[in-house]
Amino acid sequence: MATVIRLTKMGRKKKPFYRIVVTDSRKKRDGGWIESLGYYNPLVEPALVKYDAQRLEYWKNVGAKMSERVAKLTSKK
């Protein structure tokens, strides 16, 4: 199973926030996920990003690929 770390959209119309999740690469964006690692809220100023760094590192070491957006968000800390 090829795993990826990516964002899944939550919230409501015009008020989105995103979860940082580990999922199978073949699933849809908002399909089921294996583990939730954190969240990203772009609506507050400054944008809020919180995630479990240990679990993120674990999944990267196991072989999960990160999406470009998640890589940018997690490198800012």
UniProtKB/Swiss-Prot annotation:
<comment type="similarity">
    <text>Belongs to the bacterial ribosomal protein bS16 family.</text>
</comment>
<dbReference type="InterPro" id="IPR023803">
    <property type="entry name" value="Ribosomal_bS16_dom_sf"/>
</dbReference>
<keyword id="KW-0687">Ribonucleoprotein</keyword>
<dbReference type="Pfam" id="PF00886">
    <property type="entry name" value="Ribosomal_S16"/>
</dbReference>
<protein>
    <recommendedName>
        <fullName>Small ribosomal subunit protein bS16</fullName>
    </recommendedName>
</protein>
<dbReference type="GO" id="GO:0015935">
    <property type="term" value="C:small ribosomal subunit"/>
</dbReference>
<dbReference type="GO" id="GO:0005737">
    <property type="term" value="C:cytoplasm"/>
</dbReference>
<keyword id="KW-0689">Ribosomal protein</keyword>
<dbReference type="InterPro" id="IPR000307">
    <property type="entry name" value="Ribosomal_bS16"/>
</dbReference>
<dbReference type="GO" id="GO:0003735">
    <property type="term" value="F:structural constituent of ribosome"/>
</dbReference>
<dbReference type="GO" id="GO:0006412">
    <property type="term" value="P:translation"/>
</dbReference>
